[in-house]
Amino acid sequence: MTKITRDVSITTENSKSTSGSATASSASLPENDHPIFHQPRARIRSGSLFIEGSDSFPSSEVKSYNVYIDDSKYSEILKGDTNSSSTDGKQVFEDARDDNFHQESHRDLEDSILDLVRRDPEVAAFPLPPPNSNERNRNSSNGSSAETNLNGHSSSGTISTSVLLNMGSAEKHAGTTRGDHMESSSMKSFEKLGTRPSSLFYPPPEGTAPYQGPRATVSGNKSTRQTQGTYSFPSMRYGVDLVSPVEGAVDVAKSRVPNSTLNGTFPDKAFIPHEFQIPKKAWNRIPANKSTSLKTPRNHSLLIDILKPFEAADLANDQRSSSAVLKNTVHSNGQYNPTNETSGTRMQDQRQKNTNEIDLEKIPNPQVPLGIAMDTMRSPNQLHEKEYESNIEAGLASGVGKGDNSIKQHQYKKIPQEIDRDQQLSFQMETMPIQRIDSSSIRSFDSRIYGFSEIYSIPRVITTLCICLFVPPLFFFFSINGNNGVSNYRLMRMIMNYEHRIGLLKGFEWDIDVQWFRTLCFVLGCIEMLAIFASIGIGFGVGIIRE
C-alpha cells in the first residue's frame, strides 16, 4: 500500500530518483518526535484506488492527512496492462481513473485529488498502527523496503503531492509523465513480488526476457530523452531538451506574425547613417566636367593709386580693357580658351612687378602729415626718437629697394638692436596703466605760465595757511610727510581744485608735486616761531627796563 502524506505546516518532499523519473518519497519526523495517534479516522471508498486517513499530534494542533493506494487494485491494473497488448499506457491510466473516481473528464480527476488532500478529516473508525510504524517509516524514507501492516497497507514509498498535481496539470505531457509515474510505481510493486521489470535503468535479471508491453512508445520516447541527458519530470526539465520547446515556441510565434512586418523591421541592406546637409569644401567636390573655371582679373592695389596715381590709372584701364576683350571673346566664340586667360594673367603679374620696383626715394611718404601732427603733441625727446626711427626705416628701405650693398654688415647687426631698444622704451613709457593728469601745469613750478589755478584752489590754500597762523605747530605738522605728518593724498584733497579733487583715488600714483606747499609751511612756521620768541623777549626787556 503506497502512502501519500500531506502536512499542513511541514511538507517533506524528497524527490530522490535513480531511474530519471518521479520517485516515491516519504514524510519522516525527527527521532525525538514520536507520532501518537488518537482516534485515527479513515474513510474507505468502495472500488477506489485511493484510501484516505488522518493523524493528529497532541503536542501541537498540526494535523496530517494521509492518502493510501491499494496495492491489490494497483497490481490488478498493472496485470491488465501487461496482459493487454492493444491498449497503451495512456488508455490504461484512463481506465484506472474511471474505475477509481467514476468521472469522465481529466479535469475532474485533478479537482478530486485536490479536494481529497485539502478536506478536513471525517469521523471514522481506524485501527491503531503497530508500535514500530515510526521505524518502518524511517526505513522507507532511507530507501529500504517496508513490511505490510495489519490492514494490508504498505508504506514502501510515498508519492509526493506535487507529482499527483503535476500528473494531471498538462495533457500534452500525459504520454510521458504518466508512463514514468506508473513505471516508478510498478517498480516498487515488483520488488515486493521478488521480480523486476526490464527498462533502460533496470536491466532484466538473468534468465528472464526483457519487459515488452504496450508502453513501448512511451519507453522509446523516454529512452530518447535519457540519451540526450535530460531529467524526465513534468515540472522540472534540465539539459538540452529545454532548448527545443523554446525554439519551437519561437518558431510558432514567428509563423503567427506576418512576414511583411519582420522583413520591414530588419532590412537586408547595410545601415546608412543620416547625411547632414553640411556644405563641403570646394576641393572635396569633384565636378562632373573637369574644366578650369574662369578666373577673374586681379584687383589692383589701392597703395599703387596713392603712390603713383597716373600709372595706377593706366594699369586699371589696361585691366578693364583686357577683361572686356576677354569677355567679348568668350561670348563671341561660345567657349572658353584657357590659354588666353593664362597669358592675360601673366601680363598682369609682370606689370605689378614692374610697378613694385619703383625707386622708393621718388615716392612721397603719405604718412608725413599725420606723423608731423603726432610729433607736435609729444615731448622733444619723443620727437628725436621718432626722427631716429624714421631715419632707420628710410635706410633699410633704401638699401632693400635699391638692391646695392652700401650698408655694411655691422650696420645690419646694430640696427635691429636699436629698434628693439626703442620699442621697449616706448612700451614702458606709453602703455603702463598709471593714473595721470595730462596737463602742462601739472607741477607747481608751472605757475609762471598761469596754470596754477587750474589745479590748485587758491582760496583753499589761503584758508589753510590762516589756520596754521593761529595754530603755529600746524606749519610743522604739514611740512612733515609720513606717519607723523599729513600724507600727500590728504594734502592734495585740502588744496586742489574741485574738478581734480573728485577724481582722486586712494592708492594710485599721482604725478603732482606738493613739496612746495610743505616747504612754504615750514618756512612760515619758522618765521612765526621767531616772531613769537622775539615778542616774548621784547616783553621781558620792556618790563625789566620799567622796573
Swiss-Prot record:
Post-translational modifications: N- and O-glycosylated.
Domain of life: Eukaryota
Leader peptide range in chain numbering: none
Region Disordered, residue ranges: 1-38, 123-160, 194-232, 326-358
Biased composition (Basic and acidic residues): 348-358
This protein's record includes keyword Calcium: no
Task of the protein: May be involved in positioning the proximal bud pole signal.
General remark: Present with 952 molecules/cell in log phase SD medium.
Quaternary structure (record): Interacts with RAX1 and RAX2 at the birth scar in budded mother cells.
Family listed: Belongs to the BUD8/9 family.
Name this polypeptide is given: Bud site selection protein 9
Organism from which the protein derives: Saccharomyces cerevisiae (strain ATCC 204508 / S288c)
Gene: BUD9
